[in-house]
Amino acid sequence: MPAPSTTLLIEGSFSELAEEFAAYLDALNKPDDTTVQTEVAPLLQPLREQEQNDTQLDQSKRDEVLKKLVSAATVLNTAPEKEITPAYNLLIHLVQQASDPDMFLSRICSYLAKPIPSSPQFGASLSIAILSTIFNTLAPTDSSRFHVLLAIVTVIRQSGSSAAFDALKPQLTAQLPNWRSTWELDDEEARRLHLAIADAAQAAGDLDWAQTHVVDALQTIPPAEASSPAARDLAVRALTSALTHPAVFDFTPLTAADAVQALRSSDAPLFELLEIFTADTLDAYEDFISATPVENILPDNALAPHAEALQTKIRLLTLASLAAAATTTTGPSARSLSYETIASALRVPQEEVEKWVIDTIRAGLVEGKLSQLRSEFLVHRATYRVFGEKQWAEVQGRLMVWRRSLENVLGVIRSERERFVREAAAAAAAAAAEGEKGDKNNKGPSERRRAPQEIAAAE
């Protein structure tokens, strides 16, 4: 997996290593006449002389040698298992001495993205390890890392290894946005990368990651291309995946995409189904299905196997809508849903109401408490499926209530503070008055004692 930068330490001059690698390729090929050594020998001779004279190597000659070596390197995948990694490491070392290594790395990545016949059990692990070495020998800002990462993800998809994908996920989570920015990927390249990750995630059984990156890929489609066949296919894939995914209940990222909006004209039944799952209930869904059976929504009949899952999801969403409406009511039945109301809305027996409520709670759509004694569901919290003008008005109303409550609290605090100040001032004034009175009482007797002395002195 991609990790901190790696340096390959391989001793030998370019001509020596190139000749050694050509001989190894010939040993794998077992050719009858023309060999790689024969082809590169005339090119290596002047390079060898330049190395001996310690002069600047002819870069064009070196690139010509590398072209022949890389072209013949397709045979490396047939090498014995223990020799594959050292052989590719040598090739990577040679390619790094090219005037433009990127022109060779993409071809090497394509070789590694193919199966390794000599190691059917560990071939994918070997390819990922070698590709990771290539990735980590490149500078973090080198856009060639994009092609290497694509190859790594392709190998994981082909192997279907959940362990390999799980090992890559932390790097993708932490680095993918930065990589996209650093490599300056355009919309098409970003879309290729997200779709490759989505395919690998799906092959590894990680449906959440697959759905996330399909939506990310969808968001890279510019408005001008929203009606193109490729955009239509991606929008249908994203929408089908979201509708059938057991944990996806928020369709806002999809409805905001231009390519999905374009389905309104190209795939009207599918878009209508999206609108039902976005804001409507089981009643609207059943009316829609009666007019447009599931198998007729898409030309390839992709939704037919998921008919039961679709009905389950719309029931959960219907209950979420009921709960959200209950939170806005007032009176004795505020925030309360009777079993009878729920059973009627979901078209299920009352005996199954608790099961559906529990499933909706598990889905994170509502929170509350079931009362078997009173046959009701007390709603504590509910998810709004659509947050529009009505919901903003409700938020404004609640904020006004909280504001008035806070103003009342502030008024009480202000009154208490003023009362405390008044009482403190009164207490201080009373204490001062008591002090003055005490001073007068203490001063009177002393003056009376001094009076006879003053009279005697006067006499």
UniProtKB/Swiss-Prot annotation:
Signal peptide: none annotated. Pfam families: eIF3m_C_helix, PCI. SMART domains: PINT. Residues 434-452 have a biased composition (Basic and acidic residues). Keywords: Cytoplasm, Initiation factor, Protein biosynthesis. It is found in: Cytoplasm. GO terms for molecular function: translation initiation factor activity. InterPro entries: COPS7/eIF3m, eIF3m, eIF3m_C_helix, PCI_dom. Residues 431-459 are annotated as: Disordered. Residues 207-384 form the PCI domain. GO terms for biological process: cellular response to farnesol; cytoplasmic translational initiation; formation of cytoplasmic translation initiation complex. GO terms for cellular component: eukaryotic 43S preinitiation complex; eukaryotic 48S preinitiation complex; eukaryotic translation initiation factor 3 complex; eukaryotic translation initiation factor 3 complex, eIF3m. Belongs to the eIF-3 subunit M family. Component of the eukaryotic translation initiation factor 3 (eIF-3) complex, which is involved in protein synthesis of a specialized repertoire of mRNAs and, together with other initiation factors, stimulates binding of mRNA and methionyl-tRNAi to the 40S ribosome. The eIF-3 complex specifically targets and initiates translation of a subset of mRNAs involved in cell proliferation. Component of the eukaryotic translation initiation factor 3 (eIF-3) complex. This is Eukaryotic translation initiation factor 3 subunit M. It comes from Emericella nidulans (strain FGSC A4 / ATCC 38163 / CBS 112.46 / NRRL 194 / M139).
